Amino acid sequence: MAKRQLNRRQNWRIEKIQGERAARAAKRESSAVEALEGGDLGPEQTGLVIAHFGVQVEVEALEGELAGSVSRCHLRANLPALVTGDKVVWRAGNQGIGVIVAQLPRTTELRRPDSRGQLKPVAANVDMIVIVFAPLPEPHANLIDRYLVAAEHAGIRPLLLLNKFDLIDEQNAPALNALLAVYRTLGYPVLEVSAHHGNGMEQLQQQLDGRISVFVGQSGVGKSSLVNSLLPEVDTRVGPLSELSGQGTHTTTTARLFHFPGGGELIDSPGIREFGLGHVSRSDVEAGFIEFNDLIGTCRFRDCKHDREPGCALLKALEDGRVQQQRMNSYRSIIASLPESSY
């Protein structure tokens, strides 16, 4: 059944109610912080945000007597929005509730637009973005390329991970092999694993060790199953594929950070079906297609749109086979999705 469209007044009323609720929650949180700071708080120490729950976060102590322990913390009102992976300065309270007093600088930040088009960080200090896809639901190069552009734009190393490779058969093998060949030719690291059978999981663990990684990909590709295989002691609920859409049902409800025994961390985030790139410019997208690097700026016309213009270096490379048609299609699709202000 089609979703009911809301008129302007209904949208305004919903936003007004949500704003009032947020204001009341912020006031309650401010009162709680004041009460804590009025009592006995421990010394300032560094911590790592491992989960976010509305106006509170879970912080793992990184030093001192509490090192390794986890505390629920309030946030001071003057702090920016925190996300999983943030390093912070916090103070412990007497009753297991602490207060975050400062955010430490981020080395990297993974952001995406929310439902209103506003940029929101989803993970911080990430070293590697693992782009997960599977034979089912059918992988789309355009979505993979959007993740790659986001990774290049954020300065985060990407890893392409084909999960459920045991589901490859005579029907889907040609398309999957062709898809993987494109990225291997470009030099992107590609792994094929099966979280269900365990194949390739040791090689994946080697890639994850020593890094802070985040798994991204549409629902149903097995991100939660991968976490369960890598960290058997963690109970991440797994939802079945929808019989109607072939896409997975959302299971993980909040980004959470897990430690691997051999070193390194994983941030498991909710499935993302469409990764928006409204915050990037045309030049950012061009830079995200690494095979374009030596071609951009060599077209006959400075304002070349790489469409049908004579003397276009990208079109010549496409004709020569140095640029794959699949990648050019993705590039054009991403460019077409950008707001005009990004041009």
UniProtKB/Swiss-Prot annotation:
<feature type="binding site">
    <location>
        <position position="299"/>
    </location>
    <ligand>
        <name>Zn(2+)</name>
    </ligand>
</feature>
<feature type="domain" description="CP-type G">
    <location>
        <begin position="116"/>
        <end position="275"/>
    </location>
</feature>
<dbReference type="Pfam" id="PF03193">
    <property type="entry name" value="RsgA_GTPase"/>
</dbReference>
<dbReference type="InterPro" id="IPR004881">
    <property type="entry name" value="Ribosome_biogen_GTPase_RsgA"/>
</dbReference>
<dbReference type="GO" id="GO:0003924">
    <property type="term" value="F:GTPase activity"/>
</dbReference>
<feature type="binding site">
    <location>
        <position position="306"/>
    </location>
    <ligand>
        <name>Zn(2+)</name>
    </ligand>
</feature>
<dbReference type="GO" id="GO:0005737">
    <property type="term" value="C:cytoplasm"/>
</dbReference>
<comment type="similarity">
    <text>Belongs to the TRAFAC class YlqF/YawG GTPase family. RsgA subfamily.</text>
</comment>
<dbReference type="GO" id="GO:0019843">
    <property type="term" value="F:rRNA binding"/>
</dbReference>
<dbReference type="InterPro" id="IPR027417">
    <property type="entry name" value="P-loop_NTPase"/>
</dbReference>
<keyword id="KW-0342">GTP-binding</keyword>
<feature type="binding site">
    <location>
        <begin position="163"/>
        <end position="166"/>
    </location>
    <ligand>
        <name>GTP</name>
    </ligand>
</feature>
<dbReference type="GO" id="GO:0046872">
    <property type="term" value="F:metal ion binding"/>
</dbReference>
<feature type="binding site">
    <location>
        <position position="312"/>
    </location>
    <ligand>
        <name>Zn(2+)</name>
    </ligand>
</feature>
<keyword id="KW-0862">Zinc</keyword>
<dbReference type="GO" id="GO:0005525">
    <property type="term" value="F:GTP binding"/>
</dbReference>
<comment type="function">
    <text>One of several proteins that assist in the late maturation steps of the functional core of the 30S ribosomal subunit. Helps release RbfA from mature subunits. May play a role in the assembly of ribosomal proteins into the subunit. Circularly permuted GTPase that catalyzes slow GTP hydrolysis, GTPase activity is stimulated by the 30S ribosomal subunit.</text>
</comment>
<keyword id="KW-0378">Hydrolase</keyword>
<keyword id="KW-0699">rRNA-binding</keyword>
<keyword id="KW-0694">RNA-binding</keyword>
<keyword id="KW-0963">Cytoplasm</keyword>
<dbReference type="InterPro" id="IPR010914">
    <property type="entry name" value="RsgA_GTPase_dom"/>
</dbReference>
<keyword id="KW-0690">Ribosome biogenesis</keyword>
<dbReference type="InterPro" id="IPR012340">
    <property type="entry name" value="NA-bd_OB-fold"/>
</dbReference>
<keyword id="KW-0479">Metal-binding</keyword>
<feature type="binding site">
    <location>
        <begin position="217"/>
        <end position="225"/>
    </location>
    <ligand>
        <name>GTP</name>
    </ligand>
</feature>
<dbReference type="InterPro" id="IPR030378">
    <property type="entry name" value="G_CP_dom"/>
</dbReference>
<comment type="subunit">
    <text>Monomer. Associates with 30S ribosomal subunit, binds 16S rRNA.</text>
</comment>
<dbReference type="GO" id="GO:0042274">
    <property type="term" value="P:ribosomal small subunit biogenesis"/>
</dbReference>
<protein>
    <recommendedName>
        <fullName>Small ribosomal subunit biogenesis GTPase RsgA</fullName>
        <ecNumber>3.6.1.-</ecNumber>
    </recommendedName>
</protein>
<feature type="binding site">
    <location>
        <position position="304"/>
    </location>
    <ligand>
        <name>Zn(2+)</name>
    </ligand>
</feature>
<keyword id="KW-0547">Nucleotide-binding</keyword>
